[in-house]
């Protein structure tokens, strides 16, 4: 496909569910249908095809999502991320309480120079967006493919400083 648009179900499934066992390269720990749908959307795109999905933001840094991030951000590249400040105003007519983002991804091996990150308070104030253009390597970083959702220049500067550290806290003996 040239384009895929999705609002997949947000639902954890058992590790031994057929959907999870069919995709062991992306499923680890506690699989969720939304990232299985997103993986299949990306898989079914033609080269340079685009997808837009509204999904929870938990995949951006959660340990259970590492395999998904590795697949998703190797086969595709983030071009735009939209953040909602409110957890309960995205699906205001439903009882969904979820930190939700909209992502635009292109199926390509070519890494873009930047990612656009926009944010709004709810699903009804897209006319009042804040917008930030951030270097791709600052947003998607590390061997775990973490996605850093910065919203202003101060956060960008903090992230630049953090990326200069070459060791993790556990690597220097700090335990939590």
Roles of regions detected by a PLM:
Residues 1-176:
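Signature of N6-adenine DNA methyltransferases within the class I
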């Amino acid at each position: 496909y040239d384009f895929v648009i999705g609002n997949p179900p947000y639902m954890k499934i058992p590790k031994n569910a057929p959907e999870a066992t069919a995709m062991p390269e992306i499923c680890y720990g506690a699989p969720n249908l939304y990232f299985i749908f997103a993986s299949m959307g990306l898989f079914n795109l033609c080269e340079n095809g685009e997808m837009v999905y509204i999904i929870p933001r938990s995949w951006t840094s959660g340990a259970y999502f590492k395999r998904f991030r590795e697949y998703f951000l190797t086969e595709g590249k983030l071009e735009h991320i939209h953040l909602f400040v409110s957890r309960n105003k995205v699906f205001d007519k439903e009882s969904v309480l979820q930190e939700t983002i909209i992502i635009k991804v292109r199926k390509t091996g070519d890494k873009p120079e930047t990612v656009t990150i926009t944010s709004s308070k709810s699903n009804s104030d897209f006319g009042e967006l804040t917008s930030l253009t951030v270097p791709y390597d600052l947003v998607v970083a590390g061997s775990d493919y973490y996605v850093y959702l910065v919203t202003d220049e101060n956060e960008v500067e903090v992230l630049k400083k953090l990326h200069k550290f070459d060791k993790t806290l556990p690597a220097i003996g700090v335990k939590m």
